[in-house]
UniProtKB/Swiss-Prot annotation:
Domain Sushi intervals: 292-356, 357-423
Domain of life: Eukaryota
Biological source species: Rattus norvegicus (Rat)
PTM comment: Cleaved and activated by C1R to generate Complement C1s subcomponent heavy and light chains.
GO biological process, one term: glial cell differentiation
Keyword Cell membrane listed: no
Name of the molecule in the record: Complement C1s subcomponent
Amino acid sequence: MWCFVFFSLLASFSAEPTMYGEILSPNYPQAYPNEVVKTWDIEVPEGFGIHLYFTHLDMELSENCAYDSVQIISGGIEEERLCGQRTSKSPNSPTVEEFQFPYNRLQVVFTSDFSNEERFTGFAAYYSAVDVNECTDFTDVPCSHFCNNFIGGYFCSCPPEYFLHDDMRTCGVNCSGDVFTALIGEIASPNYPNPYPENSRCEYQIRLQEGFRLVLTIRREDFDVEPADSEGNCHDSLTFAAKNQQFGPYCGNGFPGPLTIKTQSNTLDIVFQTDLTGQNKGWKLRYHGDPIPCPKEISANSIWEPEKAKYVFKDVVKITCVDGFEVVEGNVGSTSFYSTCQSNGQWSNSRLECQPVDCGVPEPIENGKVEDPEDTVFGSVIHYTCEEPYYYMEQEEGGEYHCAANGSWVNDQLGVELPKCIPVCGVPTEPFKVQQRIFGGYSTKIQSFPWQVYFESPRGGGALIDEYWVLTAAHVVEGNSDPVMYVGSTLLKIERLRNAQRLITERVIIHPSWKQEDDLNTRTNFDNDIALVQLKDPVKMGPTVAPICLPETSSDYNPSEGDLGLISGWGRTENRTNVIQLRGAKLPITSLEKCQQVKVENPKARSNDYVFTDNMICAGEKGVDSCEGDSGGAFALPVPNVKDPKFYVAGLVSWGKKCGTYGIYTKVKNYVDWILKTMQENSGPKKD
């Protein structure tokens, strides 16, 4: 038993690899002992095999060498078991048994049972290192492609376009690293349509510009990859990965997935993995970038150019607002802007929108007002009104304006021009009822003669015919380019005049046919006794101030004998004193001969020297007349063919031979053309 242990310990001892060696059974060449187990570990250098041969074998014979035996073991597997006797097979060779193994390690185990009836001497064996052809001597081929043997080893090599993996045995294709950036392309497995290489991992990358989504197209007949095994596992496979999406792995004869794969990404990774076997042709696919769409509407109330059913990445459109709408950015408005479909599927300038044009707060008008509008945007309507009853609108339909597409308030008749409130002429707020003469007549109110203008020095009168114009007699303003004038007061008291409107003169325009004379007292020719005074500022109309109408040129405005007209003024009375309260009266028109027959009161003039023309009207009756201080005031007649009382200036107080009798009035109808032309040529106030 101790002997068994001793030999076992010796057998487990390992030494450095050697090129050759000798193995002898215990006690050789004497009889080997019973109950012995001994092991020899043989190791030659890497890259060599072992040639083992026996020159002597003499052991107990038994069935299957069950009693005594020599075992040859490689990698735990019994290669051979020997027992019995052997003799040389060749007379020239001492070898009785020999073996050659392609491995560089072997175990030889000697075993004897508990008794031997005969004397057996055991065995003698020798081993040596021999070169191995690894490329042919093994069942498993060591190289995937080309195997190259040399003494003590071998090396593997690969065909062109292949490379040797780190295991130095298998070849693969260098098919990774390709990056595709074109919007349209085709990708195929290596060697397609020839069989693809084994033991390879091909990685392809598609990297498109942001704003495109990758779409793959694969025909079934363009896909041939080693089918899955019985458990459904793909040893060769094609896989697609796009951000958070994965498609595959796919394998088989004919593409098993959808023929069109639409990703939501502009990047895609393709992985084609193969194992060591297979003779399939591989695959081919096509891809293209599908541009990301943008919503069709950026801003309502707009027109797009060009018009398309679908807008996609990089499309540029011109967006034009429809009439009445505009794009407002800051304080600047425009009717159009450009927008580009961006890579994120959103339009540039999406913050801009077509908003209704805002016409803004309507401008105020003189002597009128505009109602507060509910809104001031496109389509809104406003109404202007004049300050009634003292003003009226020049155009009957001129009060309604709508907010137009161009951002202006527009009237159907006037366009963008603002309405004008024209003073109502010839309508007193209180009709004159007392029929008393001025010369010694009764007082009246300014409301009955709102057109009456008071000239302070020399005292005289005038007629307001427009907010900028006063009509008077030429001799009232002769030699006075800046007369002091008031309107709106009945009394000439200082405190009352303070509350009246003082009129500031812009210019005095005397009729060009009026003959200038230095001394009024000696004047006998009052032909063309008419003048206009233009005012610097407009007169504000009201219950005490209003213009009188001008006559028209039709025959209806020809004064006729017997017509009753109104006169007013602050001239002297029969006791030859000037009054401070306005007086008025009704006077009939009479024939010019009646005025010619009046005895002259002026001691400096003869009756026959006075000039009478068709430019004059004679009016009055005994005791009813105008007098000094009334000059220039209006002789008012009712406007013909109107329902409500309205007056026009038929004449201007001009002169008379004697107060309290018949007086001469300048016939205004003869000067209407000159009046209108002069007013037009000097329209508006003079600006400082």
